[in-house]
Regions:
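Exposed, low-structure sequence patches enriched in small/polar residues
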Residues: 1-391
Length: 391
């Protein structure tokens, strides 16, 4: 038996001219149920054997409340503390006492119980009240994501004499995902308060090996403009975060990225170089034409051929990536990957004639790793590229 729930909603608004807002909601929930039937000859009919459910869960989300926090260590500590609150909130038997291994937790719902860790993780990193937030991840509602664009900045009276085009961009995208879950084969629906011998926790109906929360401002702010004399400028600042909660080894992998990009371009029209096919031609002619003027020696000079465009491009970017691995209850924060990366590139393109295009370029890249086991890397390259078109 298969079940699939899909939601894909989009709303586009234009509050005023050239200002567009796009809001989206997404959800994809899949459940596949499988069981075997067997007649054992006892006369009791068919027996239901090994019922199994597998599936996935994916929704658009909103975790912006904690994205800009500077102290990620205190946020993680809050996540660990919130587990005790969710342990007490879980539905339990009437005479339930304290957990034998974790006195601060309710019976059957210890600090490493899946039904305790996952809702505490979602509430903490979403900035929700742990006393009122949801207990079941599959009942979480999708949240809006958005994209904002304004393309009318150059039409303002103060700017229309300088700019020929301009836009401002802002966008937010976030996902909450369970890539795969499956039935716990040891779960007994007729004995829901049966505990595991090793941890004294109740068995969960399903096992969720991994929960992922991603979000990004792409960009947080982006600006593009072009002047009347063909100067182009772009600015982008983006923030990304990825949180992966692993329920197999009780580890949280947090990836944070920030990137700043600045670009500059200029198209210089009618540039004439003393080579190629755009220099003046001198010829001797007995009779000058209308577009030729004889000089003192009787030679005629043909008007200079119109030059081609010279395109200049400069790009500068700085990116900061850091990945931390944290293990629950071990007070361990280990940077495993990451680097600060500086990139600079510039290029000049010029079409000498209809057959030959010349390009000069220089690229610089500097990587400073965040872990001591790696070494800084610097690369630089430059050169001239000649492109020939055979006709």
């Amino acid at each position: 038996r298969n079940y699939n729930q899909t939601l894909d909603a989009r709303l586009t608004l234009e509050p005023f001219s050239e200002f567009n807002i796009e809001i989206s909601l997404n959800k994809n929930y899949t459940r596949n149920y499988l069981e075997f039937f067997k007649n054992d000859g006892s006369g009791a009919g068919l027996k239901h054997l090994t019922p199994t459910e597998v599936g996935s869960f994916n929704i658009s989300y909103l975790g912006i409340n904690t994205l800009f926090g500077k102290n990620v260590d205190s946020l993680y500590a809050q996540f660990e503390r919130n587990r005790a609150i969710f342990s007490e909130r879980q539905p339990n038997k009437p005479d339930a006492g304290n957990h034998p291994n974790d006195p601060g937790y309710a019976e059957g719902f210890g600090r490493k119980n899946q039904n305790v860790i996952i809702p505490a993780f979602i509430a903490t990193y979403t900035g929700l009240d742990p006393q009122n937030s949801g207990l079941d991840i599959f009942k979480t509602s999708p949240r809006p994501n958005w994209q904002l664009t304004y393309n009318g900045l150059h039409k303002l009276p103060i700017l229309n004499k300088v700019l020929s085009g301009a836009s401002i961009r802002h966008g937010y995208n976030s996902k909450l995902m369970v890539n795969q879950y499956n039935t716990d084969v040891f779960y007994d629906p007729d004995s829901v308060y049966r505990t595991k011998a090793l941890t004294a926790d109740y068995y969960s109906r399903i096992e969720i090996p991994n929960v992922v929360m991603t979000e990004s401002f792409s960009p947080l702010i982006g600006i593009d403009f072009k002047t009347l004399n063909d100067l182009q400028f772009n600015f982008d600042y983006s923030i990304q975060r990825s949180l992966s909660l692993n329920m197999i080894d009780y580890q949280l992998i947090e990836q944070n990225s920030k990137e700043l990009t600045i670009g500059f371009g200029w198209r210089i029209k009618n540039v004439v170089f003393p080579f190629g096919n755009n220099k003046p031609q001198r010829t001797r002619a007995p009779r000058p034409t209308d577009d030729q003027t004889p000089d003192a020696r009787g030679r005629t000079t043909t008007a200079a051929k119109k030059g081609n465009d010279l395109n200049l491009k400069f790009d500068l970017s700085f990116r900061d990536d850091l990945t931390n691995n944290r293990v629950l209850d071990q007070d361990q924060n280990v940077p495993t990957r990451g680097a600060k990366t500086l990139r600079f590139s510039n290029a000049a393109d010029y079409e000498l004639n209809d057959r030959v295009t010349l390009r000069l370029f220089f690229d610089y890249n500097r990587i400073i790793p965040a872990v001591q086991e790696s070494f800084p890397i610097t690369t630089a390259k430059g050169g001239i590229t000649v492109r020939l078109a055979l006709k």
